[in-house]
Amino acid sequence: MAAASSSRVLLAAVAVLAAALAGCGAGAALDDPAGLLRRAKEAEFAGWMVGLRRRIHENPELGYEEFATSELVRRELDALGIPYRHPFAVTGVVATVGTGGPPFVALRADMDALPMQESVEWEHKSKVPGKMHGCGHDAHVAMLLGSARILQEHRDELKGTVVLVFQPAEEGGGGAKKMIDDGAVENIEAIFGVHVADVVPIGVVASRPGPVMAGSGFFEAVISGKGGHAALPHHTIDPILAASNVIVSLQQLVSREADPLDSQVVTVGKFQGGGAFNVIPDSVTIGGTFRAFLKESFNQLKQRIEEVIVSQASVQRCNAVVDFLDKDRPFFPPTINSAGLHDFFVKVASEMVGPKNVRDKQPLMGAEDFAFYADAIPATYYYFLGMYNETRGPQAPHHSPYFTINEDALPYGAALQASLAARYLLEHQPPTTGKAKAHDEL
């Protein structure tokens, strides 16, 4: 009798413990975005992501050099029991969670840092001179690993396969294009990308249907004349004067040739020529970037930039050679959000952070190589995750040596990415047929 009573007490204790575990965030249902956010905000979970972010931040790596970052990602995936393939595009990693069959939806994080010196003095400052995570990619990797952990905890509930894409070389290297070329995203139906935003409040997400970021390209031109003594300009052919006229003329491409309602940018950010006060150099090198949302406008800008540089140099008796640098820096197409995915995003995000915290985002003239995925995947969606908190004081902008991450944003990114992927699979089940379909695996 006593033994039976003890057994009942033990069973009751186990039941209480199980109920307690079910009540915590880890027991949140996969189709409950708010519950997944609570899970990601738990002290141990959030602290784990913060630790990952700081380790990556201390050891920044430039595009196609993310070997240590890639190793960290693979080590964490191993610890979570998540299978992956490696390498893609030198350092890229592609992991999968779920059934291994369709539908397939992807989540992407970029891994590379910037060639700049960090000026923020804190415990986890960059240990690599001249390199810094100044755009938040360290946070992106930590959040995607957080999403991986959430999804792995619910792997038996997934109605398909989530593909986790850890991509190198977003900052000008076109890593997304090389991931595609290496077969990293075959058979995927939709992909979501996120970027931390310094001007969007914490707990708020923002995006829009259609164009969200511009297409971009770079150009460089060498303008050659005839050098000589500055006191005898009539014996020279001055490339500095020619380059100055070129730069002024380039500004007219937007102000006088572009439709004011069709946003375009041409900026010259590089001017190198001469090294002495009293010497006219033989040549000058200028360089810059051009941006547009429409493919036709982008191509028109490219054509006119070359025409203006060559023609204006000729007027000044100089020669010019223009290089668009697209072999090493491929042109980025505009980032276009699929209209159907926007409605889906608003619905899922509203369930997590509330409708008032899902906001429209004006298009940006910045560029994102996430745009390349639209060439290989039917539906793509890119959004911004808020991290601004006025109590922290002024937030330095992206690509500033004083840029910092509000680590309170990490749980929001991890939970929302996981929720978007899981809900997408649930709502895009393939039709049931008696025959196996083609392309039913990655």
From Swiss-Prot:
Cited PROSITE patterns: ER_TARGET
Compartments where located: Endoplasmic reticulum lumen
Methyltransferase listed as a keyword: no
Keyword RNA-binding attached: no
GO molecular function terms attached to this record: IAA-Ala conjugate hydrolase activity
GO CC terms in record: endoplasmic reticulum lumen
The protein's Enzyme Commission number: 3.5.1.-
Motif Prevents secretion from ER: chain residues: 439-442
Function of the protein: Hydrolyzes certain amino acid conjugates of the plant growth regulator indole-3-acetic acid (IAA).
Protein name per UniProt: IAA-amino acid hydrolase ILR1-like 1
Source organism per UniProt: Oryza sativa subsp. japonica
